[in-house]
Amino acid sequence: MADPTGFLKIPKVEAAKRPVDERVGDWREVYERQDPHERAGEVLQQAGRCMDCGIPFCHSGTAGCPLGNLIPEWNDLVRRGRWDAASDRLHATNNFPEFTGRLCPAPCEVACVLSIAEEQTGGSVTIKRIEQTIADQAWMDGIVEPQPAAISTGKRVAVVGSGPAGLAAANSKAG
């Protein structure tokens, strides 16, 4: 699967943040927007830093990803340039990675084994950035498309809440 020494060969590269003076005046993203195809090369390398640990705490619901995203799996697929398969693995556990990947505080990166000894390892894998790129590229390349309900049953369901959990519940009831 992954190169277990990739983190030793490839330095961690963080996404560029917008200047603070600019960010305090709006509600836009903290990070600079960049075309996913432009950042794909960087993200391929960063995914190669994942060492596919024996016990990947990054996707454990107690310490890492609360959704249980299959992070080592899609990191390896991205590393090999298999964006369509990476998107499939990401969507297997996450209905809306295109916005959860931006809103999430990324406990997966804190739980990453490489974050334990940051000075020696260079820090955690940039999981959040990789997830954003998978989702963005999937939309731009037509791998993911809007999915309207196949048929209308005529029934109505009320979902309280417009956050990610409410939207995921509504999405599962619509299909």
Regions found by a protein language model. Give the residues of each.
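Ferredoxin-type iron-sulfur electron-transfer modules and their immediate structural context
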Residues: M1-R156
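N-terminal Rossmann-like FAD-binding beta1-loop-alpha1 element of flavoenzymes
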Residues: K155-G175
